[in-house]
């Protein structure tokens, strides 16, 4: 397993964030993003990404998130309405809840690749988890997740064991010194990145180490099904193909 140990304890480094009136409304409404322009003050304001941001209204805690000084979305909100201890239990609970929401996919033998975590929709802003058969691909859209990466992997393995874990990073996310980077295998044996999987019975493949996103656009599954249904008896030319998923769906439908 690659070294994904924390370079600091996020719980020991906290930023006290006091939002503007507009920012406070956003936090109270459950908005997963708190922008830099909606922050009146942050103390201290020089802590690294991944530090715990505690949002205050006067002296009352109204929300908790992850501090991201390199992004205009300065706080990725994890909780609103009070305090939250950012600890491994939180990741286990959220990954479990996300998995429960996808119960129809997990046990479907005709679909062996699916999105486990879809960022903000699952209470984990800037984090995506896609599972291809027995390989888990973690995509970071924010450097704030780096200090928590080891705990995220441990939580994922506790909830649903994977033989291999691969890290992907958005272009704007730079790994800390000596930390694993885009395309690195964090758990399991090394491989070239190409995997074969099923999507509603169609055999597809993706390069999860170098391909776009996590290798394939798993969130487009329903759209591929719609395209296939619309191609009955038609001749179709796919001129903007990436991994060929829409072309395969069209061929199967036509």
Name each model feature, range by range.
Residues 1-133:
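Non-catalytic accessory regions of SAM-dependent methyltransferases
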Residues 70-80, 143-156:
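Extended active-site and interfacial segments that coordinate phosphate-rich ligands
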Residues 117-130, 146-217, 225:
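Non-catalytic substrate-recognition/targeting regions of SAM-dependent transferases
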Residues 134, 204, 223, 240:
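Conserved hydrophobic/aromatic pocket- or pore-lining residues that grip, position, or stack substrates
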Residues 136-140:
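Carbohydrate-binding surface patches
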Residues 224-254:
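Conserved SAM/SAH cofactor-binding pocket of Class I
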């Amino acid at each position: 397993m690659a070294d994904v140990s924390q370079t600091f304890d996020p719980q020991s480094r906290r930023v006290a964030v006091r939002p503007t009136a507009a920012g406070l409304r956003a936090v109270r409404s459950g908005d997963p993003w708190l922008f830099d322009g909606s922050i009146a003050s942050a103390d201290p304001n020089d802590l690294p990404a991944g530090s715990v941001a505690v949002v205050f209204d006067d002296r009352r805690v109204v929300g908790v998130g992850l501090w991201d000084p390199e992004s205009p979305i300065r706080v990725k909100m994890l909780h609103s309405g009070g305090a939250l201890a950012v600890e491994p239990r939180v990741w286990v609970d959220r990954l479990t809840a996300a998995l429960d929401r996808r119960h129809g996919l997990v046990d479907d033998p005709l679909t062996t690749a699916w999105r486990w975590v879809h960022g903000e929709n699952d209470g984990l802003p800037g984090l995506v988890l896609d599972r291809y058969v027995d390989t888990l691909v973690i995509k970071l859209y924010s450097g704030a997740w780096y200090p928590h990466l080891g705990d995220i992997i441990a939580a994922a393995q506790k909830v649903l064991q994977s033989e291999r874990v691969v890290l992907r990073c958005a272009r704007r996310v730079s790994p800390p010194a000596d930390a694993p980077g885009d395309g690195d295998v964090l758990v399991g044996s090394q491989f070239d990145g190409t995997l074969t999987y099923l999507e509603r019975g169609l055999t597809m493949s993706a390069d999860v180490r170098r391909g776009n996103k996590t290798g394939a656009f798993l969130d487009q599954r329903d759209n591929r099904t719609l395209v296939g249904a619309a191609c009955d008896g038609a001749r179709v030319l796919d001129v903007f193909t990436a991994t060929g998923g829409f072309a395969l769906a069209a061929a199967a439908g036509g």
